[in-house]
Amino acid sequence: MKITPTSTPSETVRALTEGKTIIVAAVNQKGGVGKTSLTLNLGFELARTGLKILLIDLDPQASLSKNLIGEDALPNRKGIEELFLSDKSKPEECIVSLPQENLFILPCHNELASVSAKILLDSSSFFALKEIFEKISGFDFILIDTPPSLGILTLNSFIAAEHLIIPIAPAVYSLLAVNDLLQSIEKTRKNLNRNLEILGVAVMMIDRRASLYCQIEEQVRTFFGTKVFESVISRTVKSEEAVTEGVGVGSLAPDSKIAGEYRNLTAEILCRLGVVRPAEKAVGDERR
């Protein structure tokens, strides 16, 4: 998809939101669907437009944190679990500036798993993440990488976020799991966060040479309709390499097919948020 900005994205976002941070969570209780890769690459692409982006690692596996900060350096950093446990802890003491300009991360450690069990004992535990975000300012977007479960941490992301992106990978697609996820989202919207919406469904790790993958993609598009983004993310080793090296694929291999796919997906997301408007398709961008 070719995109024509209404003005520079950073200026338009701030004008539309009056300085309010846009909070988006990548959610799916299935593992291996590309949540971390999606969060990382959207963060990089949005940061390159001049927007100030904060990544939140809410997955106790801490893959996003380990890849962006480094496994050796991560133990020396404070993480989001400290903010869950103590009102006296300050977000600015935990947020890490990354080499990519305008990109930051609030990391976590493996201990977040035990912390999530402790916060369940608190009657206000559902709103813990939202309360943390209320102490954070100065960012245009907050992007949340959630764990592969529908537990208390994912529920916290439902309550703290305004928009959800559901990444779906054909290799691990389960309609039953999708229905469970949608029921959980709807229950949260009805009872705890009326502003919550599904911004879109992203088809991840697709290989159109495999007929089964194409069939599942069509099933996803039939089931979700216009919620599915036109842009898809291909299955490629470049994406895995980028995550491992802690950079966006657009930095690692800017001329690659998958880098273009992430640029297109980012543009679609901004378009759905009303930040940019679509123009005519560019040659070669048509969905095959």
Predicted regions and their residues:
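P-loop NTP-binding core
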Residues: 1-288
